[in-house]
Amino acid sequence: MDRIYSINGPVVKVNDAKDFSMMEMVQVGEKGLIGEVIGIDAEYTTIQVYENTAGLKIGEPVKGSKMPVCATLGPGIISGIYDGIQRPLTAMTELNGAFVAMGSALPALDEERVFDVTVTVRDGDTVKAGDVYATCRETPLILHKCMIPPDIGSAKVALAAESGKYKVNDVILKIIPDGESDAVPLTLAHKWAIKTPRPVRRRKTIKTPLITGQRIIDTVFPIAKGGAAAVPGGFGTGKTMTQHQIAKWCDADIIVYIGCGERGNEMTQVLEEFSELIDPKSGRPLTDRTVLIANTSNMPVAAREASIYTGITIAEYYRDMGYHIAIMADSTSRWAEALREISGRLEEMPAEEGFPAYLPSRLAEFYERAGYVETVSGGEGSVTVIGAVSPQGSDFSEPVTQNTKRFVRCFWALDKALAYARHYPAINWMNSYSDYADDLEDYYAENAGEDFIEVRRRISALLIEENNLMEIVKLIGADVLPDDQKLIIEIGKVIRVGFLQQNAFHKDDTFVPLKKQLLMMKAILKLYDESAAALSKNALVSDILKLGWFEKLSKMKYDVPNDKLEMFAEYEEAITRSFYEILISGETA
């Protein structure tokens, strides 16, 4: 029996251990704390413990499992809330109360829950990795598809159960893999190592945006299904609120929300709000398509790393069924801090700001598991990763933000000044970018309008021009500007307040369809073009402002319901009439 030699926080060492292998899951101490082997040398085996090690003593036993840290994948995951190593927190609360007891070893899935299973294969059928052998209704929104595990090649069905009611551990199928004689039993669930990406047939070209209903995201800085985005911002800039809003309204089939080292109250807020909110497409609560991984700031530091990998493994599992998954990781900085703490305890040579030298490779391992793929069974699915980054003091030059930028193509930089000015989402349009816009042009042309890309380009150009002029205004004031530049300042304000700013508590403004976003931009450009034409005919900016259209378009997000888009045509006609009248009155004068 191998025994503990030293304890340093979550890092435990065992001496003279010959039986352990790298990345093996172990049980540490008399209480069987879950740990993982992270280092082996001639003298010691180093173990990272995913639970609180308070009370652990030298000499206590360490048992190997001969398998890596795994997630249990099967029906019953959706609507669940788990800790970083996929222990069900609801069941643990009933067993141990409000706090997680050391060494709690509850199964990830409810083994007593009965599912109405439809078996889709018969005796003698030939099956291969990824083939669906049974289906069951997991929630009213999600049809769960039980698949042949990816590590099994071609096989023949030796025995298939009849359709009926089964629990997750009941044997549904017995298969004989090619080249073997022994039958392998398959239940509704199987295990998969969390640090091993699930295989795919091939990655596909990204062509479809993740529609969030947030104008600055969908129009200005879009993210594609299968893409990766970073949401960096200092304290109070709205990282969590932005992720909550995307999780509520995006058109992904399933949301995996990972609370990694953040406040417990935020996870409570997700639980409360998602159970009350109704999915507009199905009429069901949002919890029917949500998985929560809660590893809050007062939980063991080492488990933050496991929570990230557990979440993305669950996402890949549902992706293989053909679903589109969105992952919200809040926050990857807390995970990086956990890496730094454990690296320090291991006495590794620190790199920039004390983070370990392997920080970039760990971030890459996570973000590269996003993608739009053809699954091993020939279907399509995607995993979209949106990771919050919490740089101290809003310093975007720190290592986590800079290394994250290397692996994402969408960067939503949150601005403290915008947040404190109550401008939400507080995404700074000058510091943010999206490399997906060009890939999504065909989708926007087909589903929003042929002129969407050109309209978007003009809106972005006006924002850049306004930003440049604001530098001058800060120095010498707006009064000295010529009228054409005053017009850009005014139209920029309409774009910022009337289009980019969004009210999450307003029934029509919390989610805005793509076609309304286009019509709003076209109305703003109509006002700008008519104003510029009037200025060229010697009208004054002051007279144009008196028409009231700048204020009216700033409020159109509230005044035009999402189901009455024909009102925009009336707006444009009224704008044309107003400017015709101002020009006529000017000529008469």
Regions found by a protein language model. Give the residues of each.
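Short beta-alpha junctions and helix-cap segments that line functional grooves
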Residues: 23, 49, 64-68, 145, ...
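Short, surface-exposed secondary-structure boundary micro-motifs
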Residues: 17, 31, 67-68, 86, ...
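P-loop NTPase catalytic core
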Residues: 219-220, 226-541, 545-549
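Short, compositionally biased
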Residues: 39-45, 75-86, 142-163, 183-198
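P-loop NTPase nucleotide-binding/switch module
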Residues: 94-150, 167-227, 242-245, 280-299, ...
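C-terminal amphipathic alpha-helical interaction region
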Residues: 535-589
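Short histidine-centered loop motifs in beta-beta connectors
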Residues: 49, 54, 116-126, 156-165
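N-terminal accessory targeting/assembly segments
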Residues: 1-101
